[in-house]
Amino acid sequence: MNIDEWQRIEETAPGNKCLAKLNELESILKDAKKSCLKDPTTSMKELVACSEKTQQVFDDLKRTEKKFHTSLNRFGKTLEKKFNFDLEDIKLHSSFESKKREIDTALSLHFFRQGDVELAHLFCKEAGIEEPSESLHVFTLLKSIVQGIRDKDLKLPIEWASQCRGYLERKGSSLEYTLQKYRLVSNYLTTKDIMAAIRYCRTNMAEFQKKHLADIQKTMIALFFCSRNEVLSGTNDSHDSIHHIISNNAQLNIPQEYIDVLDLDWKSLELLFVREFCAALGMSLESPLDIVVNAGAIALPILLKMSSIMKKKHTEWTSQGELPVEIFLPSSYHFHSVFTCPVSKEQATEENPPMMMSCGHVIVKESLRQLSRNGSQRFKCPYCPNENVAADAIRVYF
């Protein structure tokens, strides 16, 4: 579908044009009223002129609206023609016939995860599935913490990060330090109390100096710059302080690297916390249902085009366990490595999984069976001189 068709609708949209004409007519009528009040003898002449102008504006509005609706109707027909497809051509109901309970569970978890607790309770009841009590507690906690971050109240996030400090340190995460840093800067920008900021830093951030000393120093210097400015200007107004500092930095003369420290990105902090929270509990950052729907939306146009081509060529899709065309998904949707057997050059599947031999090299199960003559004899590894026994091979999970 050509984007020009949509641009044509935007160009013929009557909103601004009609408003401009009505404003012009209003101005003319007001001028005519003033003229009549000033010189009543011209009233009839002014009324005739106003009537003619009103009719002219009315006719212009009708033409503008008609032109717009013509473009809109044409675009609607183009949409119908473009998206006239039958999803039944690419359905695969057999894949879901025995998975209704799993699908219902995924839906309920999505509702809980989105915070739609009442809807989730009702769905579980009507679907006849048990409510995931542990997940409910986790998602309720996450919702409370995220709301705290949005309200710039970091008490709950810091408590959670402190409780999970061991996990975060093993993972190499700087979440707890980042939360403390945001709280330090946020408190200062609100209170403008530099001594309170120094005390907070000594009490709550000393334990992070081994790893984050340079950043702590940079943060405190940024606060000292702000404090210096307040002393020199004699003001202590906390209202929208960071935006005031940024907009007036030419006069304040604070180096840009310290301005950047003060400009807190709360949305990024929220995303960082949710990522670490979900990782700590073995959950994905995004709802699995979101991922499935988004991946399906990306694949749908390609599969529909493939189905159309196969219909024209009178062929059928006979592949099992794989698609006849490649679907390119974003890198964030790549969760598992794809293993290709060095012997058969085939990709591993659930039915033909990768197997690691005692020498450490990996081939797929079918290649292992063929090399060992159905497990009846020892065989030499295709890539090293070691001999192996099929029974010693173990499945590999990527």
UniProtKB/Swiss-Prot annotation:
Q: Where are the zinc fingers (RING-Gid-type)?
A: 341-384
Q: Which Gene3D superfamilies match?
A: Zinc/RING finger domain, C3HC4 (zinc finger) (3.30.40.10)
Protein's UniProt keywords contain Transferase? yes
Q: Does the keyword Repeat apply?
A: no
| Pfam families associated with the record | CTLH, zf-RING_UBOX
Q: Which EC number(s) are documented for this chain?
A: 2.3.2.27
Q: Which residues form a coiled coil?
A: none
User: What Gene Ontology biological process does one annotation of this record name?
Assistant: negative regulation of gluconeogenesis
Q: GO cellular-component terms in the record?
A: cytoplasm; cytosol; GID complex; nucleus
Q: Which PROSITE patterns match?
A: LISH, ZF_RING_GID
Supply the CDD domains for this chain: dRING_Rmd5p-like (cd16652)
Q: What residue stretches are annotated with the LisH domain?
A: 99-131
The molecular function terms in GO held by this entry are: ubiquitin protein ligase activity; zinc ion binding
State the UniProt keywords alphabetically.
Answer: Cytoplasm, Metal-binding, Nucleus, Transferase, Zinc, Zinc-finger
Domain of life from the UniProt record: Eukaryota
Enumerate the catalysed reactions: S-ubiquitinyl-[E2 ubiquitin-conjugating enzyme]-L-cysteine + [acceptor protein]-L-lysine = [E2 ubiquitin-conjugating enzyme]-L-cysteine + N(6)-ubiquitinyl-[acceptor protein]-L-lysine
Which locations, inside or outside the cell, does it occupy?
A: Cytoplasm; Nucleus
Q: Which family does it belong to?
A: Belongs to the RMD5/GID2 family.
Assembly and interactions?
A: Identified in the GID/CTLH complex. In the absence of stress, the complex exists as an inactive anticipatory complex (GID(Ant)), composed of Gid1, the E3 ubiquitin-ligase Gid2, Gid5, Gid8, and the RING-like subunit Gid9, awaiting a substrate receptor to form the active E3 ligase complex. When cells are shifted to glucose-containing medium, the substrate receptor Gid4 is induced and becomes part of the complex, named GID(SR4). Additionally, Gid7 transforms the GID(SR4) E3 ligase core into a higher-order supramolecular assembly (Chelator-GID(SR4)).
Main function: E3 ubiquitin-protein ligase component of the GID E3 ligase complex recruiting N termini and catalyzing ubiquitination of proteins targeted for degradation. GID E3 is regulated through assembly with interchangeable N-degron-binding substrate receptors induced by distinct environmental perturbations. Required for the adaptation to the presence of glucose in the growth medium; mediates in association with the substrate receptor VID24/GID4 the degradation of enzymes involved in gluconeogenesis when cells are shifted to glucose-containing medium.
User: What's this protein's name?
Assistant: E3 ubiquitin-protein ligase gid2
Please tell me the species this chain comes from.
Schizosaccharomyces pombe (strain 972 / ATCC 24843) (Fission yeast)
Gene name tied to this protein: gid2
